[in-house]
């Protein structure tokens, strides 16, 4: 078995397990027939062959590792061909989301992002982090930005350490979001003070996406 086949088998198996758990086991299987016989894929792994990566559900270490692995694999396959990153996520862990973000900026292929359903919190941040001119939202999708959430427990000194960290993350995320949207940092800070929901058109006007996609071009 070639390295490519081994890598695809590994990603297929892992993505199948993760996405089946998210969808309560209701993941369609695609069967392809060739001269060498039949081969089955879960639908997400089949779409991976078309360079489509999904972020579905919460952003956590498990989903981030899966997304990062798929992006690195697709870069190794063809560093000059775009990757399509479809997002339907309420957000989640900042550190897990930053692992995806840094990978998007690190790899050679442009990453085109598309919001379907909801891109909230870290999901919205990753949506905005796509390649300029290649960030899309579907007409009835929703986008929500806000400041990072956190809860501090323990001794007073521990709470102080955690408070400094979340304030650092808030400032860092605000500056990165300002970079990707073209908005002043001061406006980002003001607009993310509370949950801020937007339509696709609002997200386009704000600079989170470049276009509301009604039909495939």
From Swiss-Prot:
Gene3D superfamilies tied to this protein: 2-enoyl-CoA Hydratase, Chain A, domain 1
PROSITE patterns: CLP_PROTEASE_HIS, CLP_PROTEASE_SER
Record's catalysed reaction(s): Hydrolysis of proteins to small peptides in the presence of ATP and magnesium. alpha-casein is the usual test substrate. In the absence of ATP, only oligopeptides shorter than five residues are hydrolyzed (such as succinyl-Leu-Tyr-|-NHMec, and Leu-Tyr-Leu-|-Tyr-Trp, in which cleavage of the -Tyr-|-Leu- and -Tyr-|-Trp bonds also occurs)
Subcellular location: Cytoplasm
EC number: 3.4.21.92
Sequence similarity: Belongs to the peptidase S14 family.
Protein name from the UniProt record: ATP-dependent Clp protease proteolytic subunit 2
Gene Ontology MF terms in the entry: ATP-dependent peptidase activity; ATPase binding; serine-type endopeptidase activity
First-tier enzyme category under EC: hydrolase
Top-level division of the source organism's lineage: Bacteria
Sections of the chain in a coiled coil: none
Function: Cleaves peptides in various proteins in a process that requires ATP hydrolysis. Has a chymotrypsin-like activity. Plays a major role in the degradation of misfolded proteins.
Subunit field text: Fourteen ClpP subunits assemble into 2 heptameric rings which stack back to back to give a disk-like structure with a central cavity, resembling the structure of eukaryotic proteasomes.
Organism: Paraburkholderia xenovorans (strain LB400)
GO cellular component, as recorded: cytoplasm; endopeptidase Clp complex
Keywords: Cytoplasm, Hydrolase, Protease, Serine protease
Active-site residues (renumbered): 121 (nucleophile), 146
Main location: cytoplasm
Biological processes annotated in GO: protein quality control for misfolded or incompletely synthesized proteins
Keyword presence, Cytoplasm: yes
Keyword Cytoplasm (UniProt): yes
One Pfam family from the record: CLP_protease
């Amino acid at each position: 078995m070639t390295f490519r086949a081994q890598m695809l088998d590994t990603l297929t198996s892992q993505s199948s397990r993760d996405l089946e758990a998210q969808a309560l086991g209701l993941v369609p299987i695609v069967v392809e027939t060739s001269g060498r016989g039949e081969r089955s894929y879960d639908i997400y792994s089949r779409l991976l062959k078309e360079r489509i990566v999904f972020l579905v559900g919460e952003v956590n270490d498990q989903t981030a590792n899966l997304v990062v692995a798929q992006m690195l694999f697709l870069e190794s396959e063809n560093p000059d061909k775009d990757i399509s990153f479809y997002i339907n996520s309420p957000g989640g862990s900042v550190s897990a989301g930053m692992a995806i973000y840094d990978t998007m900026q690190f790899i050679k292929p442009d990453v085109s992002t598309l919001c379907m359903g909801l891109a909230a919190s870290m999901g919205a941040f990753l949506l905005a982090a796509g390649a300029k001119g290649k960030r899309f939202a579907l007409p009835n999708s929703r986008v929500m930005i806000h400041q990072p959430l956190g809860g501090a427990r323990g001794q007073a000194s521990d709470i102080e350490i955690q408070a400094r960290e979340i304030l650092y993350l808030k400032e860092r995320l605000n500056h990165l979001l300002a970079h990707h949207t073209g908005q002043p940092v001061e406006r980002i800070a003001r607009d993310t003070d509370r949950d801020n929901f937007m339509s696709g058109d609002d997200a386009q006007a704000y600079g989170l996406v470049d276009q509301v996609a009604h039909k495939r071009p």
